């Protein structure tokens, strides 16, 4: 048990990147010896948010990875990932853990429902996306269970030597 890149610690479901609100690229673990600096923060009457450079986290998979998260004055959340591939394509999984029930309602859209409240999750991407829900049941008997939660999001493939933007909006519904 250790914190190295191939340490058994990362086989624990809750500690792996596939069980968190983040990207997984080419099915690979995030790089342990990476750094994800906050490169910009902003706050105005219209919006507040931050930008994080995830390039070193995904250095084995893509040339560049930047995530911007914005909350606007209407409480709409926008998560934008800008990725740039090199000599290999990037199979990207965008995942969010939620206690809500999820229903895919159309191309690049999903509705989340919890305690009578509803939220729309939409994806605007430069590539084709496949909306997905995943069980949150861990693969190993020794893992803690995650009752009442699922993972939602999408999968997409970014071709070699290409820049792409993946923009997710979470919009409360009345």
Which stretches of residues belong to each language-model region?
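CBM-like, beta-strand-rich accessory domains located in the C-terminal region of large
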Residues: 1-174
């Amino acid at each position: 048990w250790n914190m190295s890149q191939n340490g058994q610690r990362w086989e624990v479901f809750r500690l792996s990147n596939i069980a968190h609100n983040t990207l997984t690229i080419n099915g690979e673990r995030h790089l342990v010896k990476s750094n994800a600096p906050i490169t910009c923060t902003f706050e105005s009457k219209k919006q507040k948010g931050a930008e994080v450079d995830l390039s070193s986290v995904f250095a084995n998979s893509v040339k560049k990875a930047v995530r911007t998260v914005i909350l606007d004055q209407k409480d709409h959340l926008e998560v934008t990932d800008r990725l740039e591939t090199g000599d290999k394509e990037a199979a990207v999984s965008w995942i969010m853990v939620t206690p809500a029930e999820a229903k895919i309602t159309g191309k690049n859209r999903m509705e989340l429902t919890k305690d009578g409240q509803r939220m729309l999750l939409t994806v605007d991407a430069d590539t084709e996306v496949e909306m997905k829900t995943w069980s949150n049941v861990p693969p190993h008997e020794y893992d803690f269970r995650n009752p009442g939660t699922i993972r939602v999001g999408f999968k997409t493939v970014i071709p070699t030597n290409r820049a792409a933007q993946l923009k997710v909006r979470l919009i409360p519904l009345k």
